[in-house]
Amino acid sequence: MSPSSTTTCTSLLEELQMIWDEIGESYNERDKMLLELEQECLDIYNKKVEKTRKFRAELQRSLAQAEAEIASLMSALGEKVSFAKKEGSLKEQISSVKPVLEDLLMKKDRRRKELSETLNQIAEITSNIAGNDYTVSSGSEVDESDLTQRKLDELRADLQDLRNEKAVRLQKVNSYISAVHELSEILSFDFSKALNSVHSSLTEFSKTHSKSISNDTLARFTELVKSLKAEKHERLLKLQGLGRSMQELWNLMETPMDERRRFDHCSSLLSSLPDDALKKGCLSLDIIREAEDEVRRLNSLKSSKMKELVFKRQCELEEICRGNHMDINSDAARKSLVELIESGDGDLSDILASIDGQIEKAREEALSRKEILDKVDKWRHAKEEETWLDDYEKDENRFSAVRGAHKNLKRAEKARSLISKIPAMVDVLTTKVKAWEKERGVPFLCDKQPLLQTLEDDIVIRAQREEEKRQFREQKRLQGQLATEKEAKYGSKSAKKKPLGQSLNTDNVTKTPIGRRIGNTPGRSVTSGGKDYRGNAVIPLNYVALQKDD
């Protein structure tokens, strides 16, 4: 007890003695009161000691707890912390441990926060992939017993894997969205409605939510894109079919190009493939309806136009046949066409296709006949010149000095040269015709007559004419010989001299019947031999420039 406290207690005791003296308190009472004071002081001391003892125990417990917590934190954090434990009082020991504990607690809070954020992100991405709604309260709880850096690294690696998967899925979703958008423009349907049918988070009105990347969303997208591509393919095939129908009908009815240009967008699709990039709206239902309406309109005009085209093609076929001297019964063919069209038994397209086939065959046959027909034309021309020369040589005034006489003389000279080539022409024609008939197994008809038979007939007729000419020349020779003998025997009689070049026996000349000539007949003939009889005609003495054959 300090001196000041002792002095205070003594003075108080002295004051108490004085009071007791004044009161007249007995010594027994005084002793009793003093004992009570001592007891009360002792109780107070005891209380103080007990309180101090408890405080010491509390400090010891705090120190032990701090040390235990440090050990637990080091285990949870996976870190080892070295610190020097002081040998001093409990308070000094606690003050040395407290900073270490606080540092570890800060690390724990930081690590727990990092783990919690990582786990929440993992839970969020996992929920997105699973297609579940995510809230922060549904995140995973942090395991307080494992707050190590290794655990954090593992979770972060898992998070990165999930982020990569999310990025891949998001890329797929964006790719699907682009595909749906492209198809929506081609097919002209509501893009937002299509996306909303997959998931509401995909529309532009759901900007507050991330796009769904769940398996269900990807599966729905796959089915949607597949169905849209199938629809695109179906519409493309339909429009291509309508386009081909329009092309056929336009060509059939010779529709002007101005009318066709309205449907260039359909015609441009004829060579397109299902995977090709197409123009916006080119496969819309409105485009298909317009094409269907046009095909219906063209089909309604087709019947009347087809009749006109059928007869036009028939005329073309007949013209080809006539121009190439091929056999065709025009009247019977037209009558048959009229009956077939009016009865309705035959499809006009089939009829037209049949006629087109006949035209193609006729053109092919005409091409194969061209060389022969060209030679037939030359042969006919020679025959015509032969006929003209016959008529010319019968004209007694052909040598008169009239206008154009010199032209006729030149023509006659050329005609004799051309006529001399007729036998060779007939030989070549016969060879060509036989080769043609052997190759095709059918007779070569020219104006409905077998050309080979016509050529053979011409050979016979020409031989007959040559024989008649020979007999005529022999008769003339005998007549001339008889006249010479008479003149030698009886002398010449004065007679009026006939004009130069005039035949002495004009009235006795045997003429070839024109009716037996074939220059104007449908057929043509070839003679394999024989000379031209023109050289045996009576020629005036002064016509020395003209060709003569004996």
Curated annotation (Swiss-Prot):
A Pfam family of this chain: MAP65_ASE1
Microtubule binding, annotated site positions: 401, 412
Primary localization class, coarse: nucleus
Coiled coil: 46-174, 288-310
Location of this chain's protein in the cell: Nucleus; Cytoplasm; Cytoplasm, Cytoskeleton, Spindle; Cytoplasm, Cytoskeleton, Phragmoplast
Disulfide bonds: none
Residue span of region Disordered: 471-531
InterPro entries hit by this protein: MAP65_Ase1_PRC1
GO terms for MF: microtubule binding
GO-annotated biological processes: cell division; microtubule cytoskeleton organization
Expression induction: Expressed throughout the cell cycle.
Cellular component GO terms held in the UniProt record: cell cortex; microtubule; nucleus; phragmoplast; plasmodesma; spindle
Protein family: Belongs to the MAP65/ASE1 family.
Quaternary organization: Forms a dimer. Binds to MT, mostly with coaligned MT, both between parallel or antiparallel, forming thick bundles. Bundles polymerized MT via the formation of 25-nm crossbridges with cortical MT.
Function: Microtubule-associated protein that bundle and stabilize adjacent microtubules (MT) of the cell cortex. Confers MT resistance to the drug oryzalin. Promotes the formation of a planar network of antiparallel microtubules.
Name the UniProt record assigns to this protein: 65-kDa microtubule-associated protein 5
Gene: MAP65-5
